[in-house]
Amino acid sequence: MLHTAFISNILANYLGAMSIILPNILTVSGDIKYIGAGLASVGILGTGVGQGLIGQGACLAIGRNPEMASKVTSTMIVSAGISESGAIYSLVIAILLIFVV
């Protein structure tokens, strides 16, 4: 019983605070679009890690077999281009959120 009263008290306080804060947040749409753009650009982190792993694999492959350097390099460039598309999409969404919305 004690937990039920405690949780209902916390929930009532939370909803009371949100009823005051939420209308102010919704009117400040200019600031929220920058937060959304920042969250949209989180996709760039995976691209950086992926391209680092691609470069590492290419360097290891060329180190093991230097004769295949041209094929490994061309495959590495194609793979880096494919992984870069996620960062470009994230950047486009962030720019749209900042300048269009």
UniProtKB/Swiss-Prot annotation:
Keyword Transmembrane helix: yes
Localization terms from the record: Cell membrane
Presence of keyword Transmembrane: yes
PROSITE patterns the record matches: ATPASE_C
SUPFAM superfamilies the record matches: F1F0 ATP synthase subunit C
One Pfam family recorded for the sequence: ATP-synt_C
Major localisation: membrane
An MF annotation (GO) of this entry: lipid binding
Bilayer disposition of the protein: Multi-pass membrane protein
Site (Reversibly protonated during proton transport): 84
GO cellular component: plasma membrane; proton-transporting ATP synthase complex; proton-transporting two-sector ATPase complex, proton-transporting domain
InterPro entries, alphabetized: ATP_synth_F0_csu, ATP_synth_F0_csu_DDCD_BS, ATP_synth_F0_csu_sf, ATPase_proteolipid_c-like_dom, F/V-ATP_Csub_sf
This protein's UniProt keywords: ATP synthesis, Cell membrane, CF(0), Hydrogen ion transport, Ion transport, Lipid-binding, Membrane, Transmembrane, Transmembrane helix, Transport
Chain ranges passing through the membrane: 35-55, 81-101
UniProt family annotation: Belongs to the ATPase C chain family.
Subunit structure: F-type ATPases have 2 components, F(1) - the catalytic core - and F(0) - the membrane proton channel. F(1) has five subunits: alpha(3), beta(3), gamma(1), delta(1), epsilon(1). F(0) has three main subunits: a(1), b(2) and c(10-14). The alpha and beta chains form an alternating ring which encloses part of the gamma chain. F(1) is attached to F(0) by a central stalk formed by the gamma and epsilon chains, while a peripheral stalk is formed by the delta and b chains.
Protein purpose: F(1)F(0) ATP synthase produces ATP from ADP in the presence of a proton or sodium gradient. F-type ATPases consist of two structural domains, F(1) containing the extramembraneous catalytic core and F(0) containing the membrane proton channel, linked together by a central stalk and a peripheral stalk. During catalysis, ATP synthesis in the catalytic domain of F(1) is coupled via a rotary mechanism of the central stalk subunits to proton translocation. Key component of the F(0) channel; it plays a direct role in translocation across the membrane. A homomeric c-ring of between 10-14 subunits forms the central stalk rotor element with the F(1) delta and epsilon subunits.
Protein name: ATP synthase subunit c
Species, as recorded: Mycoplasma mycoides subsp. mycoides SC (strain CCUG 32753 / NCTC 10114 / PG1)
Lineage of source species: Bacteria, Bacillati, Mycoplasmatota, Mollicutes, Mycoplasmataceae
